[in-house]
Curated annotation (Swiss-Prot):
The keyword Hydrolase applies. It comes from Serratia proteamaculans (strain 568). The record marks 445 as: Transition state stabilizer. The gene is glgX. Removes maltotriose and maltotetraose chains that are attached by 1,6-alpha-linkage to the limit dextrin main chain, generating a debranched limit dextrin. Keywords: Carbohydrate metabolism, Glycogen metabolism, Glycosidase, Hydrolase. GO terms for molecular function: glycogen debranching enzyme activity; hydrolase activity, hydrolyzing O-glycosyl compounds. SUPFAM superfamilies: (Trans)glycosidases, E set domains, Glycosyl hydrolase domain. This is Glycogen debranching enzyme.
Amino acid sequence: MTELTPGIAAPLGAYYDGNGINFSLYSAHATGVELCLFDEQQREVRLPLATRSGDIWHGYLPGGKPGQRYGYRVHGPFDPAQGLRFNPNKLLLDPAARAVEGPVADDPYLHGGYDRPDRHDSAELMPKCVVIDEAYDWQDDCPPATPWGKTVIYEAHVRGLTLQHPEIPQVLRGSFAALGHPVMIAYFKRLGITALELLPVQQHSSEPRLQRLGLINYWGYNVLAPYAPDNRYSSLRTDMTPLREFRDAVKALHKAGIEVILDVVFNHSAELDTDGPTLSLRGIDNPGYYWLTPDGGYVNDTGCGNTLRLDQPQGVAWVMDCLRFWVGECHVDGFRFDLGSVLGRTPAFDRDAPLFQAMLADDLLSRCKLIAEPWDIGPGGYQVGEFPGRFAEWNDHYRDDMRRFWLQGDISLGQFAQRFAASSDLFNQRGRAPYASINMLTAHDGFTLQDLVSFSRKHNQLNGEGNRDGSDRNFSNNHGVEGPIADDAIVQRRRASRQALLATLLLSQGTPMLLAGDEHGHSQQGNNNAYCQDNAITWLDWATADDSLTAYTAALIHLRQQIPALQHDRWWQEGDGNVQWLNAQGQSLSAQQWEQGDLQLQICLSQRWLVVVNATQQAVEMTLPAGDWQLVAPFTQEDSRAVLPAWNQAAHSICVLVKKK
């Protein structure tokens, strides 16, 4: 009979040291823990995890090898009104598992029980944790450490980005390996992006509701095992594990100077609400991991059924250990925190919350880019501009105001300039820098750029929610007809709007984030919440990509990298030579023009680059500042130099000129 020796309390999870496996699990309220080992025939051996150090239960399995499948059964009181939901009939996943095998089924046997513990054993239906050998040869890999001022982020989905790429071997498409394939790296370099921000790559499951509809959670925000690379993104080659494949991709991207940022989910878990399955945290230490209501229910500040509690030492330690794993063992360069306000709840939002303090003080995380989605749906959850220290934040003010400027025409030049200048009204405080504003026009959540100019309302019927899901506040404009099919005049107006929006994004101060596919003209057919569409709606179609738009985008990124005012990451000040704001006549704007003037503007950057903006319905003749000006790529206008200093700027357009030295 296999027996455990005491082992050690750290690290959490299952760690193979070359001679055996150390198992370590946190539970403050349990009365007992059983380690459950499974062979290839799913036969189970239960071993008491008898040694307890504080609230950590641990044991060592001599001779244990990588590939060992395991889970836990945790004993303790079942008293939902007090927040306690222990049920040893339910096999539980290790919250620190490095690998997980098998899907989560939609089955009532996974439920832990309502008023009394459910008696059905869930082991046969449950995924199993898998012990891995974490050794890896990183060779001479080192982080690119791109300065914020030079950073251009590209948000992408591992599967959707490469699944239909004709130049990538079919066995690799949609996988981690495809991200590091020479074809993709060459594309990233041509485009000019410096950081790849990946939608969640951690092992996740699809909600029971989606499974019943024949859909899946495509985006991956229903995270099951935050340490484990998702098997769905493995090429399934016999000599390759998901972790090794992910590391190989990171190493290849780093060699090309491209950073890797992970979208991580520490706001809720895949266990959902009281009707959800008992898979891990709920059965291990429910009150330790979740915010609970006075009657033992779940606080739902996330809209996903539960809210993780991260104000206590163990919750902080769990998240920190996970982040350190991804940085230390996988060499990632940063994180984007989904519904990031949850990280600072105590339960009200506090920028000095324990988790924030731990992250900002950690030596390993000090080199990482930290990006918050600065809201959740709970009380006081909207916290744009309020995150601490080195955090950057998704700026929805930028997104909405720039859409309104170009597609609705209902904001002032002053508002436009405020957003163009890194939203200093939101971020120029407490010593923060312009990079803190993550400027975006689109993201995975919402319309693509092509749909933004082709649809005036959402079309989410395929999601199975009666088109009730997704935002109705899009500030989009179909330019005269709903949908992709339109006459040439409308197509041209849409193209002009796309170009103006892209130029604005890539020439604004702050950190630009480009949604993968926007440079192709990718459409999701009007679906602005395609979280459950693992099909041609979300997969990029490389065969039909708009190559001219891609070239236009790449030229804009190249232009951005030439303008010092966009690189040095310091707030623009009056008279510092970084920016000068001029009206159509080449004069300083009056207060009235800032608030009520026509949407026409000249922005001189670094005393040499002139951004000419006309968001009105008609062409306008502008008087350029003194100097010998020349149009720069990607902008074109026949015989433009012949009419200087008068300049005729087309309706709904933007261009850049450079002053000859």
